[in-house]
């Protein structure tokens, strides 16, 4: 497996290329940026990645919270689709094959049935772009009151009958709903990428890696069981070099099965 982190984990006071150099120095093979809306920023990141040898893991789509694909307002759904197309193009231009997408948000104005149908209709519209660019749409489990069981998540992904729609599994996000290693074994080959973070069930908050209630040895074993060889990306609170070094070391222990 390859080790990565979200770009925002790295010190914000450094220039972009220096941030990637630090990532490489501390043992990260890749970084995950958010959607870039300016071509100049895409070119800058691509050049920094080439100069440092750090890969772009995938692109985290940015429009899906402000403009959910499940919104009752067509205008918002269209904005979300447009933002996702930008993210898919970003990934292609940066040499990646995956974009993270939050598919829907269930709330007081959007019921579960509507979230399911609207998000599926929107993603179906995005599949031709994904296919053309060679970039997968990876649906992530987040705190959006949607896809609340591994069987449902599996069926949702399978409903598209397309290799361009996959799962982006977040280990820490799922802990209040279920057992991460169980979800991994059910989702299996559908998993395109994995976010890792840790969570304290008693305090009900995210905590540093290996300081919460995630059973990391069991998660590691489940990943071996499904023969996952892709990216593990730390989506955690970052900071200075010392903080990021600690994140890298914690990930090394997780990868070692400790």
Q: What residue spans do the PLM features occupy?
A:
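Histidine-acidic metal/acid-base catalytic patches
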Residues: 1-4, 9-27, 96, 150-166, ...
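N-terminal pre-domain/capping segments
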Residues: 1-92, 162, 189, 245-258
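Active-site-proximal loop/turn and secondary-structure-junction residues that shape catalytic pockets
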Residues: 9-11, 35-37, 62-65, 103-107, ...
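Active-site acidic/histidine proton-transfer and metal-coordination neighborhood
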Residues: 13, 51, 70-169, 174-176
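Residue-level detector of anion-binding/catalytic polar loops
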Residues: 29-30, 55, 97, 136, ...
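Conserved beta-strand positions in the central sheet of alpha/beta enzyme cores
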Residues: 32, 58-60, 100, 138, ...
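Glycine/Thr-rich phosphate-binding loops of Rossmann-like dinucleotide-binding domains
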Residues: 41, 65, 109, 204, ...
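Catalytic-core regions built around general acid/base machinery
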Residues: 44-52, 122-132, 183-186, 218-222
């Amino acid at each position: 497996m390859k080790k990565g982190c979200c770009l925002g984990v790295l010190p914000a006071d450094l220039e972009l290329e220096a941030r990637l150099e630090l990532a490489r120095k501390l043992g990260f093979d890749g970084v995950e940026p958010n959607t870039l809306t300016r071509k100049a920023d895409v070119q800058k990141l691509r050049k920094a990645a080439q100069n440092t040898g750090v890969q772009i893991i995938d692109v985290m789509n940015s429009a899906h919270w402000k403009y959910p694909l499940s919104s009752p307002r067509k205008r918002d759904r269209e904005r979300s689709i447009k933002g996702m197309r930008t993210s898919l193009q970003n990934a292609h231009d940066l040499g990646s094959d995956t974009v993270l997408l939050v598919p829907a948000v269930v709330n007081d104005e959007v019921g579960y049935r509507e979230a399911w149908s609207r998000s599926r209709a929107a993603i179906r519209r995005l599949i031709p772009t994904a296919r053309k660019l060679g970039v997968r749409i990876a649906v992530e489990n987040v705190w959006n009151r949607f896809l609340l069981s591994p069987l449902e998540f599996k069926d949702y992904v399978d409903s598209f009958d397309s290799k361009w729609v996959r799962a982006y599994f977040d280990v820490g996000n799922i802990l209040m709903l279920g057992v991460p290693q169980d979800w991994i074994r059910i989702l299996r080959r559908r998993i395109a990428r994995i976010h890792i973070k840790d969570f304290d069930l008693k305090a009900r908050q995210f905590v540093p890696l290996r300081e919460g209630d995630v059973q990391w040895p069991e998660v590691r074993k489940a990943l071996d069981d499904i023969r996952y060889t892709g990216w593990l990306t730390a989506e955690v609170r970052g900071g200075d070099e010392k903080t990021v070094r600690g994140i890298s070391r914690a990930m090394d222990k997780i990868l070692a099965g400790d």
